[in-house]
């Protein structure tokens, strides 16, 4: 049995450098838990001159970690999609274990990698929610269960912005600037605020929970950029919080996947998750509801998850990458058949008969109102009507909103948020 495992590390940014730091600082406990010594033999970076003072070789030759026979595990922390995918394919072709934190690459290529890998281990715990061990929970801890549903706060940036808007009455623009100033949001935050990052993670979790190969373009994805303080005020008034959720539900003949802002009751555990923290609620048919909470990003939480994969590979505890012997064939639920309650915000002319017009259109689409709030806009002839509905379907609600937008008394495109009970 080998007494030492050698790592080829691709990328020495925030996460990569923290992996190196933890492997050095915690080397004794890692050795005790892995059963072997784990050392970085070589790291590959774009600019060798910027990375000095390490006890291992620094190279700018990506092929060298693949071809080096002394390297047992390649750890990819470079970012991007196609270049990491090519690295993964070449690594697995050499029957070397591969560890990645790359959610975007896995969202597009997870099934191809599983087919290439065969019995060669692939670790990707760090790809979803950083320090939360949700991958292992779905693959191992909950493997005796049918996963009935899961929903979660999968993106820390959007959760921080929504928390600031809810607690401090900040505008979306100001909350985003604050997140960027603190380093929680990128200068180009599009993937975070538009729900794409959360959707990447949802697809990976859905593969583990249901064995399906869903594509990004097949699922409903909406971001948080259209949410305004008025929406937060309505939520507070009626006992809700607003969170960007990734949601999965198993129906008898299909799987429902969606990412969007959701109003959730304050009694719901996820409503208490604030700031940059992540959390996922999973319901199994035997275990019931379980909740997983923790830091979803950052150098140390993500590096911790990367090293947990390395230790698991060192223990030779390999298993099917996505947890299913054969791909499952359940289709995705069509977007227009989604059923939930809804909230909408309308800017209208402040005149008689407007609300009766709105009520009539909702009734014609078999939509019944639950709560209503009307706000006059001072020194204008305009008002805002905010309302929530009882459960209906997506097709009916979208049709009603389209008809409402065509009313002369409705002055702007209606805004909508789904309620997740």
Swiss-Prot record:
Gene Ontology terms: biological process: methionine biosynthetic process; threonine biosynthetic process
EC number: 1.1.1.3
Positions with a binding annotation for NADPH: 15, 46, 103, 298
Pfam family, one: NAD_binding_3
Cofactor(s) needed by this chain: a metal cation
Enzyme class: oxidoreductase
Binding site for NADP(+): 15, 46, 103, 183, 186, 298
Signal peptide: none
Pathway terms, separated by semicolons: Amino-acid biosynthesis; L-methionine biosynthesis via de novo pathway; L-homoserine from L-aspartate: step 3/3; Amino-acid biosynthesis; L-threonine biosynthesis; L-threonine from L-aspartate: step 3/5
Record's catalysed reaction(s): L-homoserine + NADP(+) = L-aspartate 4-semialdehyde + NADPH + H(+); L-homoserine + NAD(+) = L-aspartate 4-semialdehyde + NADH + H(+)
Entry keyword set: Amino-acid biosynthesis, Metal-binding, Methionine biosynthesis, NAD, NADP, Oxidoreductase, Sodium, Threonine biosynthesis
Cofactor binding note of this UniProt entry: A sodium ion is seen in the structure; a metal ion may subtly affect the relative position of the nucleotide-binding region to influence enzyme activity, and could increase the stability of the enzyme.
Superkingdom assignment: Bacteria
Family in the record: Belongs to the homoserine dehydrogenase family.
Function as written in the Swiss-Prot or TrEMBL entry: Catalyzes the conversion of L-aspartate-beta-semialdehyde (L-Asa) to L-homoserine (L-Hse), the third step in the biosynthesis of threonine and methionine from aspartate.
Name of this protein: Homoserine dehydrogenase
Organism: Helicobacter pylori (strain J99 / ATCC 700824) (Campylobacter pylori J99)
Organism lineage: Bacteria, Pseudomonadati, Campylobacterota, Epsilonproteobacteria, Campylobacterales
Gene transcribed to yield this protein: hom
